[in-house]
């Protein structure tokens, strides 16, 4: 994890700018004759404004940007076009003081992806205000994009539309569960566009497009559909035929899981049939599944053989599987680990939990001290520990579950005593006396 002072401007602002072709798609979808007011809450260098400028619509657009240089670029893009007003300010501050009592027919943009620890104290308070005022809990796991989405939906007019480029985490992570329920409740129709290829390859961040429609006078069930395309070109070329072919599905308000909406009616029927078949059992009846070890700084806590020898770390290390490529088969055995060690891979995890400072060797103390000199301990996870170098929840599992493993997930039996993994994979513990 980078320190705040060392993090890039993109990370601190959370800005990885939207390709113009994608901005044009969202604008073309969102702008209609009924749209008279538009909000762009984080306009960056103005991709959405450039797309909007080419529209002949009679609207007023309010655009907000926190960085002076980017706000200036956006201002230059729309100069002399009286439909636009660019505000150089933090959206949180603008929301609190000027926007919270307004509504817009269309909200579009690419909200910033900023982790909680990169927010200022004032931003954290304002983010919390957005969440709690909309009936959602605020916590330290919530990324800035979540609060931007909530605010965007809140600011919609009675028949407003929202079109946002957001992380695919919306579909996957636990901390987005409440957000999914919020969207299901407040939007009458939701279309999610996913991509097989990366839209932002430089940051390896999967994104989706949230296209939501509000209808205050709507009665009946809310609906959702999920569409998949190869890339932006495929989206622009084939959106309408794909969109017409995929029907909306009624939203089940009793669950926040959206997996079923990816599947066809026949596929969902098959899954329900399997659930009711006594030959199958839920995995929870077989074993306990937990995320791998979250070190807070894999670069510091995961080391290779040379580092172990240089700093006398042998007594405070455990065998480590750091990456899925370190496990070629469906079992992890001693020869596999030794092969990884000899290949120079980071195959040791540091565990200082069972050694006091007085018991540490000179080399071990030196390794920690050099880490502190490099400020390895200032990341969020490390900084909240009593002893930053003592990683919690270290235990060796019976098996590993590799959820992101090339073409398919993989279940690997662990035959190496004390072997552990980082949070790149899940770990599984069987009940006592289970015949593995």
Where are these regions (language model features)?
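N-terminal, positively charged/glycine-rich alpha-helical extensions of SAM-dependent methyltransferases
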Residues: 1-7
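Glycine- and acidic
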Residues: 7-12, 133-135, 421-431
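Signature of N6-adenine DNA methyltransferases within the class I
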Residues: 11-12, 17-25, 42-52, 56-60, ...
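Glycine-rich helix-loop-beta junction characteristic of Rossmann-like nucleotide cofactor-binding loops
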Residues: 28-33
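Conserved class I S-adenosyl-L-methionine
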Residues: 35-42
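Conserved acidic residues
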Residues: 36, 105, 398
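Alpha-helical interaction/dimerization surfaces of two-component signaling modules
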Residues: 55, 77-78
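Polybasic, glycine- and aromatic-enriched phosphate-binding surface used to engage nucleic acids
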Residues: 267-436
